[in-house]
A protein has these predicted regions:
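Nucleotidyltransferase catalytic core that binds NTPs
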Residues: 1-151
Length: 151
């Protein structure tokens, strides 16, 4: 398919797309000639954590629109064995919150990179901030005395 090209695969949910997602995708882009980005389906994400806020079709369209992305594909499983074989992946990049989970790909000749998110932004932190802000304002509204109009 991509003769004599270094093929890099990265994957994620990419819910509430943010700068750390972009940094990881750009990092992956720099490791090879072709970048394939797997976007986890809503069904896959829901099998191990709360469902995404942003629907799958919107998330994959956003990832496809990035300059760094050559191909965006649905990701239906957390096991990347088949995708590595099918697409002849040379390198795999994933966030360091998955550290150690994909070491098995190295036995298949794939270089595995765990991208350091650091203490920066994450989809989970964004969701928590939104919830906390909403909760704070809701409580403030509930504590406010209703207005009475004098006739």
């Amino acid at each position: 398919m991509f003769n004599n090209k270094t093929i890099v695969y990265t994957s994620g949910t990419f819910d509430m797309f943010h700068t750390n997602h972009l940094k990881m995708i750009n990092y992956a882009r720099g490791l090879g000639d072709v970048l394939i980005v797997g976007v986890s389906t809503d069904e896959l994400v829901s099998s191990y954590k709360a469902p995404p806020i942003i629907p799958f079709n919107d998330r994959i369209q956003l990832v496809e629109a990035l300059k760094a992305t050559d191909i965006a594909i649905p990701q239906h499983t957390l096991d990347h064995t088949e995708i590595v074989k099918k697409l002849n992946i040379d390198a795999f990049v994933v966030g360091d919150d998955w550290f150690g989970k994909y070491d098995y790909l190295e036995e298949m000749g794939v270089k595995v990179f765990y991208f350091p998110y650091g203490n920066g932004i994450s989809s989970s932190s964004l969701k928590k901030t939104i919830y906390d802000t909403y909760d704070k304002h809701l409580k403030a509204v509930q504590q406010t005395k209703p207005l009475t109009i004098k006739k």
